[in-house]
Amino acid sequence: MRAKEIREMTSEDLVVKCKELKEELFNLKFQLSLGQLTNTAKIREIRREIARINTILNER
């Protein structure tokens, strides 16, 4: 998701999206610890997505 798309969302939507991404990040880290995760780059993508959302929320 691009920053432009994130800026078009409402603050409430961004908070919900951030919670969903944090849950997904938790699950991916859990899978990584069990050795089940094959695409480790997904963790980095989600962390950056969360950072983008938090940055835009702080701008408001």
From Swiss-Prot:
GO terms for molecular function: structural constituent of ribosome. InterPro entries: Ribosomal_protein_uL29 (IPR050063), Ribosomal_uL29 (IPR001854), Ribosomal_uL29_CS (IPR018254), Ribosomal_uL29_sf (IPR036049). GO terms for cellular component: cytosolic large ribosomal subunit. Keywords: Ribonucleoprotein, Ribosomal protein. The keyword Ribonucleoprotein applies. It comes from the Bacteria. GO terms for biological process: translation. The keyword tRNA processing does not apply. Gene3D superfamilies: 1.10.287.310. Belongs to the universal ribosomal protein uL29 family. PANTHER family: 60S RIBOSOMAL PROTEIN L35/50S RIBOSOMAL PROTEIN L29, LARGE RIBOSOMAL SUBUNIT PROTEIN UL29C. This is Large ribosomal subunit protein uL29. It comes from Fusobacterium nucleatum subsp. nucleatum (strain ATCC 25586 / DSM 15643 / BCRC 10681 / CIP 101130 / JCM 8532 / KCTC 2640 / LMG 13131 / VPI 4355).
